[in-house]
């Protein structure tokens, strides 16, 4: 399989330099970048007036939660979870998760996400959906034991079942992570088991961390230390840990995270919508912490549009700190691409020869994206997910001219509507 994308503005390399060039993709890698390439290809895409960008990496989400979109808004996190989300989740069966994951991944493809990190339950169904639709995903089962030994055994069994299932797929696009939910829902015994198993298998870990004031207070009261201090004492924190949120971190905790080379995933829309707080982005970046970007689940966002997430991240920190230079367009663009790839040890998030061909084409032939001048600025501050025209994952075209080629979009929309009408 080969693809030639011609006549586009290319966001090139780690520095995000804009060049006018063609891109030749062979198998699943970017093979050649240059002007007026004459190579023959199975697919030729004319990108005149368009921008060729690395695909976005959504480093924290819960894809099947699109089923809960609009279920409950404008309330606190704990009320939202206890009174709305958890009661509906108890009704969700495997078939619901499968169709929810198809809708979530469909939305991601149509808004330019090529890789995502997911945590939920019945994750074998998510893996099936991902394999079918053609995205790249890192999937985890959200483990919660609340200190109960019997529950812990069940969670361990579910996690190992998912690991075995994903390995049986032998897919280059579907990978397993360990997913202990959070320090306040997982016992030290479970967290220690995860750490040991991650070391043994070489698999990565994703976890929620210090999303709200309340959970930090709970940990302090129970253990006499902060969440990061607790995890560090357990030997949990290493460079294979991807921690979502990191809103309520002390300076000491930031220092520990930097020392352990942990990635923090910023979820500005969710943090703002649930009134959770504002992460200390400036301090994290100054300390050298790798900060990636995520949407969180659609129930608390309420979409999976990484372009919108970049804009929110950029604007939030400017107004919160009264510093217009903070979270500039290039910084948040890298959070949505290169930093996510770094967290996942993935040869993607950048357009250069030899990188994985996870590439999107953004249509700039639109009033809100003209004149074509500062392209990164336009993507962050002016564009939206609907401007993504073509999505390529692992060297395969999964969306061309806004048409998703791998599945029947209308069928997914109809099926999910029927499911949700019955569930609610």
Curated annotation (Swiss-Prot):
UniProt-listed Enzyme Commission number(s): 3.5.4.28, 3.5.4.31
Superkingdom field: Archaea
Reaction(s) this enzyme catalyzes, per UniProt: S-adenosyl-L-homocysteine + H2O + H(+) = S-inosyl-L-homocysteine + NH4(+); S-methyl-5'-thioadenosine + H2O + H(+) = S-methyl-5'-thioinosine + NH4(+)
Stored InterPro entries: Amidohydro-rel, Deaminase_MtaD/DadD, Metal-dep_hydrolase_composite, Metal_Hydrolase, MTA/SAH_deaminase
CC cofactor: Zn(2+)
Chain segments annotated as transmembrane: none
Binding positions for Zn(2+) per the UniProt entry: 60, 62, 208, 296
Xref: Pfam families: Amidohydro_1
CDD domains (UniProt xref): ATZ_TRZ_like
Annotated positions binding substrate: 89, 181, 211, 296
Record's keyword terms, sorted: Hydrolase, Metal-binding, Zinc
Cofactor: how bound: Binds 1 zinc ion per subunit.
GO molecular function: 5'-methylthioadenosine deaminase activity; metal ion binding; S-adenosylhomocysteine deaminase activity
Record function comment: Catalyzes the deamination of 5-methylthioadenosine and S-adenosyl-L-homocysteine into 5-methylthioinosine and S-inosyl-L-homocysteine, respectively. Is also able to deaminate adenosine.
Family membership noted in the UniProt record: Belongs to the metallo-dependent hydrolases superfamily. MTA/SAH deaminase family.
Protein name per its UniProtKB record: 5-methylthioadenosine/S-adenosylhomocysteine deaminase
Protein's organism: Thermococcus sibiricus (strain DSM 12597 / MM 739)
GN (gene name): mtaD
